[in-house]
C-alpha cells in the first residue's frame, strides 16, 4: 500500500486500548441488555491503522494478524460503511492497513477502538467535518464501547457503556502492568450470563434505583490518586464470576497482587486481561523489568502502560 502524493490523502491513526477501573452490573434494562455503571480509562497499548484514500469506492482492509477477518463482520469495515451511509456518498473508498498490537478477546476494547479510529480517521480523510458527538452517536449502532473509545481518557459510562460523562482533570499520572494469558479468550456474553446466574437475584429493578447508583458513582472523585489503593468502592463485578472458573485469571491476579508497590489489582472488562496500578509509568516499568521472568514462567504476556487522555491520535505522516 503506497500513499498518494498529497498528504491529505493518507493518515495514520493510533487506537488506544481501554481498561475498566470500575465495573458494576446494576440490573437488566427493558431491552434485555445489562445496565452498567463503569469508569473506563484509555491506555497506551495501541493498534495502528494506516489509511489511504482511494479514487474508487472500494473499502479494503488488511492486517498483520491472520486471525482478523477483513470482511463485513469486522468493526473497521462496519464503521467505514456506516460513515459512508451517514453522509450518503457511496463513492468514497479507502485502503486500511491494521497493525494489531492489542490482544483479541481480552476485555480491552481492541475491536471497538479500531472502529473509533476508523470513524475519526475517515471523517478527516474524506473531509466530512462531522463533530465528535455526531460520531459518538453514530457509533452506538455498531458497538457499546466505541463512543468511549472515540474521545477516550477517563470517563464514567452508563447504560451498556455508551452513555458517557466525561471526567476532566489535568494529569493522569498512574501507570500499570497489564497481563494476559495468550492461550485464552473470555466470551463477554458468557461472562454476563454467568454473573446473572449467580447474582441476578440482587439486580436492581427500576430506573429510580439505577439513578441512585449512578449518583453514587458520580459522587466519587475519580481524579483522587488514593482512590486506587484497593478501596472497597472500586470493583469489577464480572471478576466475581469469571475468576473462579478461569484459572488463567486467578493466576494473573495472584501474580499481580504479589508485586511490590502495586495498588489496585483487577480484571479488565469481562477478562481475561488483568492489571495492577502503580504510582506512575516509571515505577510500573521498573517492576515489570524486575519480574519479567515470573511473567514468562507463568505463560503471561505483560506490558507496562501509561494512561492516556485521549482514545485516538491522528497524524498525516508515515513512520
Curated annotation (Swiss-Prot):
Give the matching Gene3D superfamilies. 3.30.230.10, GHMP kinase, C-terminal domain
For this protein, the record's HAMAP family field holds:
IspE
Listed under GO biological process in this entry are: isopentenyl diphosphate biosynthetic process, methylerythritol 4-phosphate pathway; terpenoid biosynthetic process
* Superkingdom assignment: Bacteria
Pfam families hit by this protein: GHMP_kinases_C (PF08544), GHMP_kinases_N (PF00288)
Q: Check the record and name the SUPFAM superfamilies matching this protein.
A: GHMP Kinase, C-terminal domain, Ribosomal protein S5 domain 2-like
Q: Which residues form the active site?
A: 18, 145
The reaction(s) catalysed by this protein are: 4-CDP-2-C-methyl-D-erythritol + ATP = 4-CDP-2-C-methyl-D-erythritol 2-phosphate + ADP + H(+)
InterPro entries xrefs: GHMP_kinase_C_dom, GHMP_kinase_C_sf, GHMP_kinase_N_dom, IspE, Ribosomal_Su5_D2-typ_SF, Ribsml_uS5_D2-typ_fold_subgr
Keyword Nucleus in the entry? The reply is: no
Q: Please provide, alphabetically and separated by semicolons, the GO molecular function terms listed in this UniProt record.
A: 4-(cytidine 5'-diphospho)-2-C-methyl-D-erythritol kinase activity; ATP binding
Name of the protein in question:
4-diphosphocytidyl-2-C-methyl-D-erythritol kinase
Pathway(s) it belongs to: Isoprenoid biosynthesis; isopentenyl diphosphate biosynthesis via DXP pathway; isopentenyl diphosphate from 1-deoxy-D-xylulose 5-phosphate: step 3/6
The family annotation for this protein states: Belongs to the GHMP kinase family. IspE subfamily.
Q: Which organism is it from?
A: Prochlorococcus marinus (strain NATL1A)
Could you tell me the keywords of this UniProt record?
Answer: ATP-binding, Isoprene biosynthesis, Kinase, Nucleotide-binding, Transferase
Amino acid at each position: 500500500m503506497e500513499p498518494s502524493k498529497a498528504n491529505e490523502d493518507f493518515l495514520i491513526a493510533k487506537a488506544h486500548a481501554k481498561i475498566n477501573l470500575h465495573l458494576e452490573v446494576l440490573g437488566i434494562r427493558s431491552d434485555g441488555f445489562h445496565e452498567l455503571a463503569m469508569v473506563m480509562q484509555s491506555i497506551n497499548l495501541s493498534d495502528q491503522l494506516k489509511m489511504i484514500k482511494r479514487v474508487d469506492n472500494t473499502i479494503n482492509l488488511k492486517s498483520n494478524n491472520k486471525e482478523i477477518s477483513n470482511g463485513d463482520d469486522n468493526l473497521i469495515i462496519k464503521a467505514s460503511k456506516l460513515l459512508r451511509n451517514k453522509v450518503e456518498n457511496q463513492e468514497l473508498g479507502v485502503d486500511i492497513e491494521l497493525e494489531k498490537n492489542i490482544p483479541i478477546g481480552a476485555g480491552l476494547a481492541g475491536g471497538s477502538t479500531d472502529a473509533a479510529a476508523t470513524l475519526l480517521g475517515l471523517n478527516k480523510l474524506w473531509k466530512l467535518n462531522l463533530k465528535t458527538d455526531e460520531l459518538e452517536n453514530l457509533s452506538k449502532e455498531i458497538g457499546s464501547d466505541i463512543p468511549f473509545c472515540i474521545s477516550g481518557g477517563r470517563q464514567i459510562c452508563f447504560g451498556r457503556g455508551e452513555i458517557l460523562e466525561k471526567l476532566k482533570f489535568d494529569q493522569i499520572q498512574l501507570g500499570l502492568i497489564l497481563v494476559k494469558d495468550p492461550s485464552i479468550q473470555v466470551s463477554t456474553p458468557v461472562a454476563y450470563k454467568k454473573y446473572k446466574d449467580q447474582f441476578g437475584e440482587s439486580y436492581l429493578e427500576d430506573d429510580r434505583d439505577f439513578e441512585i447508583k449512578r449518583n453514587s458513582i458520580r459522587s466519587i472523585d475519580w481524579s483522587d490518586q488514593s482512590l486506587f489503593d484497593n478501596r472497597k468502592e472500586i470493583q469489577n463485578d464480572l471478576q466475581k464470576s469469571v475468576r473462579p472458573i478461569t484459572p488463567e485469571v486467578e493466576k494473573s491476579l495472584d501474580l499481580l497482587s504479589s508485586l511490590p508497590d502495586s495498588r489496585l489489582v483487577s480484571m479488565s472488562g469481562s477478562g481475561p486481561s488483568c492489571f495492577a496500578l502503580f504510582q506512575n509509568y516509571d515505577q510500573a516499568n521498573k517492576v515489570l523489568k524486575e519480574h519479567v521472568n515470573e511473567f514468562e514462567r507463568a505463560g503471561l504476556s505483560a506490558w507496562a502502560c501509561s494512561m492516556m487522555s485521549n482514545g485516538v491520535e491522528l497524524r498525516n505522516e508515515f513512520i
